[in-house]
């Protein structure tokens, strides 16, 4: 299969190198110097230092050439950008008449409109007259570094197109990666977005030294918040028990490679948000979309106390320790996700 990955950050590079073990893969990056460095050294020293990339992976600095590579039904374009870059890259893909199949990897809500990635893509395709494209999301618990190292992982592709799900499985379900299929695109995307916000909370708890019991409580009640919002938006409850819900939440909330968890830990240690983001070097989607998640919850009448507390810590100056006190002082209630 011919595959073009658009975006040479950590995740795009890792997935492209994985796919290149079995397919004809081109990795496009907008930074020509980075593309040249990867071609010369067979590594992405900026985002995945010290990890060799597959010998057959090819690199391209011209988007038109990368899209030429992925034309026709038996080909796939993968958009590997943060949510903020999704619309622009989708416009570029839509302008190329030969592309038929597109998936994206980003997780989050648009901070301005509150739109999920599939809604952003659908809006662009409607504007450009490309509703013929088969589209979907690939998501799940997967740190880019571990994928690049060839360590095992499992993911989910979500799309209304069974053919696209099957094609995506063929592209990536090999070697150390398993790919499951789902038609619950809303549920898959909500899980991938909300877990980033919740990971900030668990990181803060760990940074405060609150222990493993507190972490378990936050993950479990956070999952309830995710499920409440996701079902209110049209997702299926069982989706949140799977890889893109509980699975991704567990990884992001507890793994030391998690950028969102790192933000929470460092906030608890007294660093300012601006300082943390300046030194992080990567996007922390939980910070970008926390307000959008909270606004959607309030608009839908969904109770999300952990998420609301994260927003107050991030943007209103609430001390993490005070946020914990508030959560602990909430009235007793029956355990429920509703």
Swiss-Prot record:
<dbReference type="GO" id="GO:0005975">
    <property type="term" value="P:carbohydrate metabolic process"/>
</dbReference>
<feature type="binding site">
    <location>
        <position position="259"/>
    </location>
    <ligand>
        <name>NADPH</name>
    </ligand>
</feature>
<dbReference type="GO" id="GO:0006650">
    <property type="term" value="P:glycerophospholipid metabolic process"/>
</dbReference>
<feature type="binding site">
    <location>
        <position position="260"/>
    </location>
    <ligand>
        <name>sn-glycerol 3-phosphate</name>
    </ligand>
</feature>
<dbReference type="Pfam" id="PF01210">
    <property type="entry name" value="NAD_Gly3P_dh_N"/>
</dbReference>
<feature type="binding site">
    <location>
        <position position="283"/>
    </location>
    <ligand>
        <name>NADPH</name>
    </ligand>
</feature>
<keyword id="KW-0547">Nucleotide-binding</keyword>
<dbReference type="InterPro" id="IPR006109">
    <property type="entry name" value="G3P_DH_NAD-dep_C"/>
</dbReference>
<keyword id="KW-0520">NAD</keyword>
<keyword id="KW-1208">Phospholipid metabolism</keyword>
<protein>
    <recommendedName>
        <fullName>Glycerol-3-phosphate dehydrogenase [NAD(P)+]</fullName>
        <ecNumber>1.1.1.94</ecNumber>
    </recommendedName>
</protein>
<dbReference type="GO" id="GO:0047952">
    <property type="term" value="F:glycerol-3-phosphate dehydrogenase [NAD(P)+] activity"/>
</dbReference>
<dbReference type="InterPro" id="IPR036291">
    <property type="entry name" value="NAD(P)-bd_dom_sf"/>
</dbReference>
<comment type="similarity">
    <text>Belongs to the NAD-dependent glycerol-3-phosphate dehydrogenase family.</text>
</comment>
<dbReference type="Pfam" id="PF07479">
    <property type="entry name" value="NAD_Gly3P_dh_C"/>
</dbReference>
<feature type="binding site">
    <location>
        <position position="107"/>
    </location>
    <ligand>
        <name>NADPH</name>
    </ligand>
</feature>
<feature type="binding site">
    <location>
        <position position="285"/>
    </location>
    <ligand>
        <name>NADPH</name>
    </ligand>
</feature>
<keyword id="KW-0444">Lipid biosynthesis</keyword>
<keyword id="KW-0594">Phospholipid biosynthesis</keyword>
<dbReference type="InterPro" id="IPR006168">
    <property type="entry name" value="G3P_DH_NAD-dep"/>
</dbReference>
<feature type="binding site">
    <location>
        <position position="259"/>
    </location>
    <ligand>
        <name>sn-glycerol 3-phosphate</name>
    </ligand>
</feature>
<feature type="binding site">
    <location>
        <position position="30"/>
    </location>
    <ligand>
        <name>NADPH</name>
    </ligand>
</feature>
<feature type="binding site">
    <location>
        <position position="107"/>
    </location>
    <ligand>
        <name>sn-glycerol 3-phosphate</name>
    </ligand>
</feature>
<keyword id="KW-0963">Cytoplasm</keyword>
<feature type="binding site">
    <location>
        <position position="144"/>
    </location>
    <ligand>
        <name>NADPH</name>
    </ligand>
</feature>
<feature type="binding site">
    <location>
        <position position="142"/>
    </location>
    <ligand>
        <name>sn-glycerol 3-phosphate</name>
    </ligand>
</feature>
<dbReference type="GO" id="GO:0046168">
    <property type="term" value="P:glycerol-3-phosphate catabolic process"/>
</dbReference>
<comment type="pathway">
    <text>Membrane lipid metabolism; glycerophospholipid metabolism.</text>
</comment>
<feature type="binding site">
    <location>
        <position position="195"/>
    </location>
    <ligand>
        <name>sn-glycerol 3-phosphate</name>
    </ligand>
</feature>
<keyword id="KW-0521">NADP</keyword>
<dbReference type="GO" id="GO:0005829">
    <property type="term" value="C:cytosol"/>
</dbReference>
<feature type="binding site">
    <location>
        <position position="248"/>
    </location>
    <ligand>
        <name>sn-glycerol 3-phosphate</name>
    </ligand>
</feature>
<feature type="binding site">
    <location>
        <position position="140"/>
    </location>
    <ligand>
        <name>sn-glycerol 3-phosphate</name>
    </ligand>
</feature>
<dbReference type="InterPro" id="IPR011128">
    <property type="entry name" value="G3P_DH_NAD-dep_N"/>
</dbReference>
<feature type="binding site">
    <location>
        <position position="258"/>
    </location>
    <ligand>
        <name>sn-glycerol 3-phosphate</name>
    </ligand>
</feature>
<feature type="active site" description="Proton acceptor">
    <location>
        <position position="195"/>
    </location>
</feature>
<dbReference type="GO" id="GO:0046167">
    <property type="term" value="P:glycerol-3-phosphate biosynthetic process"/>
</dbReference>
<keyword id="KW-0560">Oxidoreductase</keyword>
<keyword id="KW-0443">Lipid metabolism</keyword>
<comment type="function">
    <text>Catalyzes the reduction of the glycolytic intermediate dihydroxyacetone phosphate (DHAP) to sn-glycerol 3-phosphate (G3P), the key precursor for phospholipid synthesis.</text>
</comment>
<dbReference type="InterPro" id="IPR008927">
    <property type="entry name" value="6-PGluconate_DH-like_C_sf"/>
</dbReference>
<dbReference type="GO" id="GO:0008654">
    <property type="term" value="P:phospholipid biosynthetic process"/>
</dbReference>
């Amino acid at each position: 299969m011919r595959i073009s990955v658009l975006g040479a950050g950590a995740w795009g590079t890792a997935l492209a190198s994985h796919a290149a073990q079995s397919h004809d893969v081109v990795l496009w990056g907008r930074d020509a110097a980075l593309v040249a460095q990867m071609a010369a050294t067979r590594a992405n020293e900026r985002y995945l230092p010290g990890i060799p990339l597959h010998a057959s992976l090819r690199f391209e600095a011209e988007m038109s050439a990368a899209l030429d590579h992925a034309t026709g039904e038996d080909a796939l374009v993968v958009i590997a950008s943060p949510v903020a870059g999704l619309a622009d890259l989708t416009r570029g893909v839509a302008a190329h008449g030969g592309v038929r199949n597109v998936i994206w990897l980003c997780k989050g809500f648009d901070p301005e409109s509150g739109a999920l990635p599939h809604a952003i893509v659908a809006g662009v395709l409607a504007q450009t007259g490309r509703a013929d494209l088969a589209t979907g999301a690939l998501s799940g618990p997967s740190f880019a570094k571990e994928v690049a190292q060839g360590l095992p992982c499992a993911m989910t592709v979500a799309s209304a197109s069974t053919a696209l799900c099957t094609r995506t499985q063929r592209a990536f379900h090999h070697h150390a990666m398993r790919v499951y299929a789902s038609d619950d695109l809303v549920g898959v995307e909500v899980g991938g977005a909300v877990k980033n916000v919740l990971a900030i909370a668990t990181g803060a708890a760990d940074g405060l030294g609150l222990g493993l019991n507190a972490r378990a409580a936050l993950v479990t009640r956070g999952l309830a918040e995710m499920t409440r919002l996701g079902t209110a938006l049209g997702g299926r409850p069982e989706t949140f028990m799977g890889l893109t819900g509980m699975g991704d939440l567990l990884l992001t909330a507890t793994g030391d490679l998690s950028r969102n968890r790192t933000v929470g830990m460092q906030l608890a240690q007294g660093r300012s948000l601006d300082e943390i983001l300046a030194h992080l070097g990567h996007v922390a989607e939980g910070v970008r979309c926390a307000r959008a998640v909270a606004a959607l919850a309030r608009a839908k009448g969904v109770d999300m106390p952990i998420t609301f507390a994260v927003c107050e810590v991030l943007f209103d100056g609430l001390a993490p320790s005070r946020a914990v006190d508030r959560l602990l002082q909430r009235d007793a209630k029956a355990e429920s996700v509703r």
